[in-house]
């Protein structure tokens, strides 16, 4: 299934369940802490979900990494379709209202593995950390800085996934 964009698509309020991915067992403590925070923020909450598509809910972790020259932010990917899905991939672009005068490039999220999503069922969310490299890094920022994720807007495009066939259908 391929979806160009969620722009202007209808949305509905929906109760979502956030699960940590199977790979959580192997993640470093910092990443796990970010995932746990976002799980706590969104698990068992009503959220505005795009009909029959994937929705990205922005988490609380935002950081400018001077080593990578990139903004990192956490998010929860929600399956707003009516079926279990796999092999999800998409493009993300960031609207930078945080660091004026700097341009951050779009990024591709390659096919997420079963280790990253588990069984990705409808109304389920999984935490991720997204990165957006800076177009022309200047190296003038030496120290990392926290970013208020309320000022970040992320757009999804080129969403692709496969429907998991149910046994016995």
Place the predicted regions along the sequence by residue.
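Membrane engagement elements in two modes
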Residues: 1-72, 84-86, 126, 132-169
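Short, well-ordered beta-strand segments enriched in hydrophobic/aromatic residues
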Residues: 71-79
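Short, acidic/polar linear motifs in exposed loop/turn regions
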Residues: 79-83, 98
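Short, hydrophobic/aromatic beta-strand segments
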Residues: 83-91, 103-106
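Intrinsically disordered, low-complexity Pro/Gly/Ser/Thr-rich segments with frequent PxxP/GP/PP motifs
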Residues: 104-144
């Amino acid at each position: 299934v391929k979806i160009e964009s969620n722009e202007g698509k209808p949305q509905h309020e929906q109760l979502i369940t956030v699960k940590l991915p199977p790979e959580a067992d192997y993640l470093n403590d910092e990443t796990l802490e970010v995932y746990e925070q976002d799980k706590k923020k969104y698990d068992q909450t009503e959220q505005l979900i795009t009909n029959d598509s994937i929705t990205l809910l922005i988490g609380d972790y935002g950081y400018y990494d001077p080593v990578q020259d990139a903004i990192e932010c956490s998010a929860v990917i929600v399956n707003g379709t009516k079926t279990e899905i796999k092999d999800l991939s998409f493009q993300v672009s960031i609207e930078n209202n945080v660091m004026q005068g700097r341009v951050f490039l779009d990024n591709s999220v390659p096919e997420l593995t079963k280790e990253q999503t588990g069984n990705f069922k409808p109304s389920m969310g999984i935490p991720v950390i997204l990165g957006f490299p800076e177009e022309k890094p200047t190296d003038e920022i030496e120290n990392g800085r926290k970013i208020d994720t309320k000022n970040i807007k992320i757009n999804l495009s080129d969403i692709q996934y496969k429907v998991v066939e149910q046994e016995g259908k």
